[in-house]
């Protein structure tokens, strides 16, 4: 066979094979369509699975095509029910670590926000860490000058408890340089205070949507708790301050339902000072342990009833829990009046345990370093100095900061009482260290039925960062 005939023969065979292959594909497609058409009638290939959760229903649609599964998740809102939160606080013997975010250590090479004032609050399903960002990242030029409390760049954001405040997992909550947040069992309510010092505004969000506002009534830095607000049977309560930080100011209790204010009352507290209350539910009421930034080294307390009647005074215990403070031996407690003459202060907390109290404080009397929690026998009702429990959380060689309270709801814990928990902020950078920035991380502890050994769960970041050396 001559070369030309060979080429023609090979070409003809190749063309025939191509045509045969195309016909096979057409037959395969027809058979597949017929088979899948029959399968749809008995639902063997296409099926929809519905799984229900506490707060949402997740529809999982599975489409199978030639052994390939495509899963599509379609979340939609299920209202749920209000949390009761009328149970008593559990009596606990110690506090075990719940979470630690290590945000500053991670932030030396990760995309982590510069923050302050972190706090924790829980829904029936999850606990979240809320924090006030500075609109900047660690180890970045915009972190310069973030020691400043109030700026238009500050926002309230949140992550699941234990996560660092990073840009990939954080959820925006509100524009704010002061804030509080809590869950009523159905949706999150967040309150963010922002604006100029003389005309600040608190914007209430419910389920992520702005629902109400509070305008500054005294024209002097309207501010709120910097920790969890408290919801009982669908109504949520929080405390706000407007006025000077170093003399008499004005204080109000607010009550909201589904993010709309349904009640408020002025707190009469002449000669006393209330800021940054740490509140929790207990026996159907809201109990708050606050900060006196004027004179007292003992802490103000507020006990709020659902009808907004209240009792105000000071934590009776014969040991001071604010910073700075004098020596314990020279302190005499009072249930009604500020004691000591140390101005300034730091946000703190306490938990009533019958007539006893667990109260947190820095270990240092003069600076925000170290942290311990003490149980004082009869310290809620009497000027007792008797310590019946003590636990160190951060040693005095390391920085601490603000601290505050929250509870685990019975829907989460499975117990018939509310588990008391607290967080400790660990501030790094300015003004104590040679950096251009100020930020913090936190350790979170929850009450248990056993004593827990002392240790130091300090921040641990090695400073300065690269940005501080430029």
Curated annotation (Swiss-Prot):
Binding site for substrate: 116, 150, 275-276, 291, 368
Annotated active site: 149, 402
Record comment: activity regulation: Inhibited by the neuraminidase inhibitors zanamivir (Relenza) and oseltamivir (Tamiflu). These drugs interfere with the release of progeny virus from infected cells and are effective against all influenza strains. Resistance to neuraminidase inhibitors is quite rare.
Highest taxon listed in the record's lineage: Viruses
Signal peptide positions on this chain: none
Head of neuraminidase: annotated segments: 89-470
Main location: virion
Compartments, as annotated in UniProt: Virion membrane; Host apical cell membrane
Intrachain disulfide bonds: 90-417, 122-127, 182-229, 231-236, 277-290, 279-288, 316-335, 421-446
InterPro entries registered for this protein in UniProt: Glyco_hydro_34, Sialidase_sf
One Gene Ontology molecular-function label: metal ion binding
GO terms, biological process: carbohydrate metabolic process; viral budding from plasma membrane
Cellular component, GO annotation: host cell plasma membrane; membrane; virion membrane
Domain notes: Intact N-terminus is essential for virion morphogenesis. Possesses two apical sorting signals, one in the ectodomain, which is likely to be a glycan, and the other in the transmembrane domain. The transmembrane domain also plays a role in lipid raft association.
Homology family: Belongs to the glycosyl hydrolase 34 family.
Note: The influenza A genome consist of 8 RNA segments. Genetic variation of hemagglutinin and/or neuraminidase genes results in the emergence of new influenza strains. The mechanism of variation can be the result of point mutations or the result of genetic reassortment between segments of two different strains.
Function as written in the Swiss-Prot or TrEMBL entry: Catalyzes the removal of terminal sialic acid residues from viral and cellular glycoconjugates. Cleaves off the terminal sialic acids on the glycosylated HA during virus budding to facilitate virus release. Additionally helps virus spread through the circulation by further removing sialic acids from the cell surface. These cleavages prevent self-aggregation and ensure the efficient spread of the progeny virus from cell to cell. Otherwise, infection would be limited to one round of replication.
Protein name listed in UniProt: Neuraminidase
Organism: Influenza A virus (strain A/Quail/Italy/1117/1965 H10N8)
């Amino acid at each position: 066979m001559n070369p030309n005939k060979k080429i023609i023969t090979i070409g003809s065979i190749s063309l025939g094979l191509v045509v045969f292959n195309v016909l096979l594909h057409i037959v395969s497609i027809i058979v597949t369509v017929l088979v899948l058409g029959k399968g749809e009638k008995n639902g063997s290939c296409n099926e929809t699975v519905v799984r229900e959760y506490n707060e949402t229903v997740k529809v999982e649609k599975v489409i199978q095509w030639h052994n390939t599964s495509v899963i599509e998740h379609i979340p939609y809102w299920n209202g749920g029910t209000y949390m009761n939160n009328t149970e008593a606080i559990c009596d606990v013997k110690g506090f075990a670590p719940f979470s630690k975010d290590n945000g500053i250590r991670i932030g030396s090479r990760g995309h982590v926000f510069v923050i302050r004032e972190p706090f924790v609050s829980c829904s029936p399903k999850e606990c979240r860490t809320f924090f006030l960002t500075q609109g900047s990242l660690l180890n970045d030029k915009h972190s310069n000058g973030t020691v400043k409390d109030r700026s238009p760049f500050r926002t309230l954001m949140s992550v699941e408890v234990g996560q660092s405040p990073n840009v990939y997992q954080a959820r925006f909550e509100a524009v704010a340089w002061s804030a509080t947040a809590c869950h009523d069992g159905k949706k999150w309510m967040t309150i963010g205070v922002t604006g100029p010092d003389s005309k600040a505004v608190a914007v209430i969000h419910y389920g992520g949507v702005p629902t109400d506002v509070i305008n500054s009534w005294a024209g002097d830095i309207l501010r709120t708790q910097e920790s969890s607000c408290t919801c009982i049977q669908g109504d949520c309560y929080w405390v706000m301050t407007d006025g000077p930080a170093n003399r008499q100011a004005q204080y109000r209790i607010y009550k909201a339902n589904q993010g709309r204010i349904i009640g408020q009352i002025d707190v009469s507290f002449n000669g006393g000072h209330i800021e940054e209350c740490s509140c929790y539910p207990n026996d159907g009421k809201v109990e708050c342990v606050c900060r006196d930034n004027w004179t007292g080294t003992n802490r103000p307390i507020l006990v709020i009833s659902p009808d907004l009647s209240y009792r105000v005074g000071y934590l009776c215990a014969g040991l001071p829990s604010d910073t700075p403070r004098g020596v314990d031996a020279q302190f005499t407690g009072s249930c009604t009046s500020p004691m000591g003459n140390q101005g300034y202060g730091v946000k703190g907390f306490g938990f009533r345990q019958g007539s006893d109290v667990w109260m947190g404080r820095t270990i240092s009397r003069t600076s925000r370093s170290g942290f311990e929690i003490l149980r004082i026998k009869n310290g809620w009702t009497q000027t007792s100095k008797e310590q019946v429990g003590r636990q160190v959380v951060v040693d005095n060689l390391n920085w601490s900061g603000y601290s505050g309270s929250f509870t685990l709801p019975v829907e989460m814990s499975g117990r018939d009482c509310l588990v008391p928990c607290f967080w400790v902020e660990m501030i790094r950078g300015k003004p104590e260290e040679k950096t251009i920035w100020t930020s913090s991380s936190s350790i979170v502890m929850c009450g248990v039925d056993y004593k827990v050994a002392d240790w130091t769960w300090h921040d641990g970041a090695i400073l300065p960062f690269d940005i501080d050396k430029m």
